[in-house]
UniProtKB/Swiss-Prot annotation:
Positions of transmembrane segments: none
Chain's gene name: DHQS
Lipid biosynthesis in keyword set: no
Example of a GO cellular component annotation carried by this entry: chloroplast
Family, as annotated: Belongs to the sugar phosphate cyclases superfamily. Dehydroquinate synthase family.
Annotated EC: 4.2.3.4
Primary location group: plastid
Protein name: 3-dehydroquinate synthase, chloroplastic
UniProt xrefs under InterPro entries: Dehydroquinate_synthase, DHQ_synth_AroB, DHQS/DOIS_N, DHQS_C
Gene3D superfamilies per record: 3.40.50.1970, Dehydroquinate synthase-like - alpha domain
Enzymatic reactions: 7-phospho-2-dehydro-3-deoxy-D-arabino-heptonate = 3-dehydroquinate + phosphate
Signal peptide limits: none
Summary of temperature dependence: Optimum temperature is 55 degrees Celsius.
Length: 445
């Protein structure tokens, strides 16, 4: 059967931030270990058959039933947040999701340790939201003092030099172990602030306030923190969980269209690997998501967080199951590293990487052509690339993938789809010919 189109989709030019200015059920997952380098994962849609402990994991005030959204915008109303719990025993924490949450100071203040706070943000987000966050931290709480450090914006600054600016501010401010770091921004800020919190004085409290779709549905949840190295993305870091994640969906009002689309790549990922019902909902509602329908976005964020929280609760340190959340990331990280950090947004690279992973899955005979076409079509609807940049070569992919974090004993393990939609494997047990064929199909040399 013919493969889908391999033409690279043109990327929208970068844009800056625009100052504007239920009951929940869980997935029933069954794991089968075939060999030390292979994890097979069958994931049904979120169902009510899970046990009571798992249900507590996903507590939420809004229904998980997936309504079909229209594309007409509605005015967001501040109300009690939806809460999704990440169940990690005595290190469990809530994810608050809703509109106007930054106007509810108690949500933040209940998770602040001590009287000293350092807000880590960037030059794009600070002019829009820093004062609001400082107000939320100090309103009715005059004994709390807040410092801030404003970092340059962009993936290319996710490095040791920039990280040192956080440590400089913390040390100059004489912060102690009773302080709290607050990450205010997208995935880069969350990753760096979390790593700084994990390292400063061997670990201090921190809170995530993600302001992009990408960070809200993925990077702020689960405790992955770190920085990039010139030889590879996220090679330096730690697992370090926040005290809470506060997702004020109003922050998406100032998010550029390109950043919105980038975050939707991770939303699509959850549907492909473990939640077929969610994928089908996305197919019906992608126009509403692209039009920023508040109800559609709130549902997509909640459902994504439920999927992520369940996986993290079962496999915090990515020994197997959690690795499946990296569908497309091995190819995508190679694009980001080879093409240059910041040239493509993370979600853009992941989108192209997912198309490559799906293509390889099809070449292995593990999925049928309908899944190939559906994955391709939904990413196109989201205005995301479906092929890597033309400058990427087979050798560039191979050299970067050789140092990927999922390499074990010299064997590159990949997340690939296998079986019906919503099923995947994390494995090193595959025909290398299929990988070569995929790379050559998407690269000119």
């Amino acid at each position: 059967m013919a493969a889908f189109s391999l033409s690279a989709k043109q990327i929208l030019s970068p844009s800056t931030h625009r100052p504007s200015l239920s009951k929940t059920t869980t997935a029933d997952s069954s794991l089968r270990f075939r060999n030390p380098h292979s994890l097979s994962l069958r994931c049904s849609s979120l169902s009510s058959s899970s046990n009571v402990g798992r249900t507590r994991l996903m507590r939420a005030s809004a229904s998980s039933t997936a309504p079909v959204m229209d594309t007409s915008p509605t005015k967001a109303v501040s109300s009690a947040p939806t809460i999704v719990d990440v169940d990690l025993g005595d290190r469990s924490y809530p994810i608050y999701i809703g509109s106007g949450l930054l106007d509810q100071p108690d949500l933040l203040q209940r998770h602040v340790h001590g009287k000293r706070v350092l807000v880590v943000t960037n030059s794009t987000v600070a002019p829009i939201y820093l004062d609001k966050v400082v107000g939320a931290l100090t309103n009715g709480n005059p004994n709390v003092s807040v410092e801030s450090v404003i970092l340059p914006d962009g993936e290319k600054y996710k490095n040791m030099d920039t990280l040192m600016k956080v440590f400089d501010k913390a040390i100059e401010s004489r912060l102690d172990r009773r302080c709290t770091f607050v990450a205010l921004g997208g995935g880069v800020i969350g990753d760096m602030c979390g790593y700084a919190a994990a390292s400063f004085l061997r670990g201090v409290n921190f809170i995530q306030i993600p302001t992009t779709v990408m960070a809200q549905v993925d990077s702020s949840v689960g405790g992955k923190t770190g920085i990039n190295h010139r030889l590879g993305k996220n090679l330096i870091g730690a697992f370090y969980q926040p005290q809470c994640v506060l997702i004020d969906t109003d922050t998406l009002n100032t998010l550029p269209d390109r950043e919105l689309a980038s975050g939707l790549a991770e939303v699509v990922k959850y549907g492909l690997i473990r939640d077929a019902n969610f994928f089908e909902w996305q197919e019906k509602n992608m126009p509403a998501l692209m039009a920023r329908d508040p109800s559609a976005l709130a549902y997509a964020i909640k459902r994504s967080c439920e999927n992520k929280a369940e996986v993290v609760s079962l496999d915090e340190k990515e020994s197997g199951l959690r690795a499946t959340l990296n569908l497309g990331h091995t190819f995508g990280h190679a694009i980001e590293t080879g093409f240059g950090y910041g040239q493509w947004l993370h979600g853009e690279a992941v989108a192209a990487g997912m198309v490559m992973a799906v293509d390889m899955s099809y070449r292995l005979g593990w999925i049928d052509e309908s899944i190939v076409n559906r994955a391709h079509n939904i990413l196109q609807q989201a205005k995301l690339p479906t092929a890597p940049p033309e400058t990427m070569t087979v050798e560039m992919f191979k050299s970067v993938m050789a140092v990927d974090k999922k390499v074990a004993d010299g064997l590159l393990r990949l997340i690939l789809l296998k079986g019906p939609l919503g099923n995947c494997v994390f494995t090193g047990d595959y025909d290398r010919k299929a990988l070569d064929e995929t790379l050559h199909a998407f690269c000119k040399s």
